[in-house]
Regions:
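ATP-hydrolysis module of ASCE/P-loop NTPase motor domains
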Residues: 20-24, 42-130, 216-218, 222
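Conserved helicase NTPase motor core
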Residues: 25, 54-59, 104-206, 218-225
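Residue-level signature of catalytic and energy-coupling elements of molecular machines
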Residues: 1, 28, 63, 87, ...
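Proline-centered turn/helix-capping motifs that create local helix->coil transitions or kinks
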Residues: 75, 95, 180-181, 236-246
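P-loop NTPase Walker
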Residues: 1-46, 148, 202, 231-234
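Conserved nucleotide-binding/hydrolysis micro-motifs of P-loop NTPases
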Residues: 2-5, 30-33, 189-193, 198-202, ...
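Helicase P-loop NTPase motor core
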Residues: 212-215, 220-272
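Phosphate/oxyanion-binding loops and surfaces in catalytic or ligand/nucleic-acid-binding neighborhoods
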Residues: 15, 39, 43, 69-70, ...
Length: 272
């Protein structure tokens, strides 16, 4: 997030000082994409770039209007949320038109809505945040001079929370790191909980195939949780076979026993 980016910038300055000769550029992948698009517009573009829509209400209205047009019904907030989630998933997973019908959004006409949504954005010269990454990736793939420029600009790349990174984000990172191979990714597929938002932990599992010279280092010491918590967590996560085998070891002394609490609804959780 932008807030996390600013916090990391502040931490770097606190550690190394404002006068450090080489202050790293700390950005979200959307921030990097924006920089790529701006550079393309200045050096190759024949007109102004599309505008990123920051007002979520504008995008929600487009989805709502299209839903009403296609179904003849008014969309509830939950319907709009699911449809927008589906749109973002398609773009982040780089799905093709042939895959749209397989996506479970609860709306049979989602493929047509998706096409019309993107058409509506282009007609307004708008792009959403996911388009920003699509355009950046397309630019890097089709303009070798721009790709070389940003590969030279980012000779060393560090990616945090890599398990939450989407497929298209990994593709952009791979393009930028291709020249030097100086890529350091920090992530844990066991902690990937944003699959519904198109997080792509498979990229971590395929890391050595994507980057043949890579080394994978496991950090198995846990400084946060007690042995009781880690015992349960290790036993639970081993049931997932699509992961790197690892056992997290505690550094803290024993704590209280772990209790399983059942709550019938959200209100019942408040007591805990």
């Amino acid at each position: 997030t932008k807030a996390a980016t600013k916090e990391m910038q502040k931490r770097f300055v606190r550690l190394f000082g404002q006068d450090c000769p080489q202050i790293p550029e700390i950005r979200t992948i959307n921030g990097v994409s924006s920089k790529i698009i701006d550079f393309y517009t200045r050096t190759h573009g024949s007109g102004s770039a599309f505008t990123v829509v920051e007002n979520e209400g504008e995008l929600a209205k487009i989805v709502s209007d299209l839903y009403r047009e296609l179904s003849g019904e008014f969309a509830t907030q939950s319907v709009i949320k699911e449809l927008r989630k589906g749109i973002a998933y398609v773009k982040n997973m780089m799905l093709g038109k042939e895959d749209l019908g397989e996506l479970d959004t609860g709306f049979d006409q989602f493929p047509e809505l998706y096409v019309q949504y993107n058409l509506a954005l282009r007609q307004r010269r708008w792009m959403d945040y996911d388009d920003q990454m699509i355009y950046a990736k397309t630019i890097l793939e089709n303009y070798p001079d721009i790709l070389a420029h940003f590969q030279d600009a980012f000779p060393y790349i560090c990616v945090d929370e890599a398990q939450d990174t989407s497929k298209i984000q990994h593709a952009i990172i791979q393009l930028l790191a291709r020249k030097t191979g100086n890529l350091f990714m920090v992530g844990d597929e066991d902690q990937s909980i944003y699959g519904f938002r198109a997080a792509y932990p498979d990229a971590l599992m395929q890391f050595e195939q994507t980057y043949p010279k890579a080394r994978v280092l496991l950090m198995e010491e846990n400084y946060r949780s007690t042995p009781e918590i880690l015992h349960l967590a290790n036993g639970f996560i081993r049931k997932n076979t699509d992961r790197r085998p690892k056992t997290v070891r505690p550094t803290r002394v024993s704590g209280a026993n772990v209790h399983l609490i059942s709550a019938a609804d959200r209100t019942a959780q408040y007591a805990w």
